Amino acid sequence: MGIDPGAANLGFGVVRIEGSRMVALDGGVVETSPELPIERRIERIHRELSELIEWHEPKAMALEDLYFGKNVHSAMAVGRASGAAMLAAAQRGVRCFTYTPQAIKKAVCGSGAAGKDQVQRMVGTLLGLPEPPTPDHAADALAVAICHGGYAPREAVAANGTPAVGGLAG
């Protein structure tokens, strides 16, 4: 399960690895109104992600790492949404991993400097979708899931006691 964290629009995407390819199972956005108090928005994110986790039973949750720009208020809201997602995962025994935006773009497009449109198109191509996924928050979450899926075999090796090649952020 991939997560594109945000307090107003949190993207989620669920993929399954089938042999050498990935298949999209679900994707969408948890929307909250900016008119609601932040605690109500975070509660809704937690509740809806908890339901999605119970439904899909993911083996892992991968989140886009917080990018700290100039807007501290926005960064705090994204951090709170990430925390709600991680709590929902932890309460159901699902391990969480984080990836930088550059690592996600590189995993999906081959370049950490890829634009949003390029990521959206590549997500559609990699998942065999007839069109690029929308909205963009859902596409970004699917990109996070694809990124983690590319690293998942390394995690399995590391879990068996053999050092992983490369590494997972976590």
What function would you assign to each model-found segment?
Residues 1-170:
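Phosphate- and other anionic-substrate recognition elements at nucleic-acid/protein interfaces
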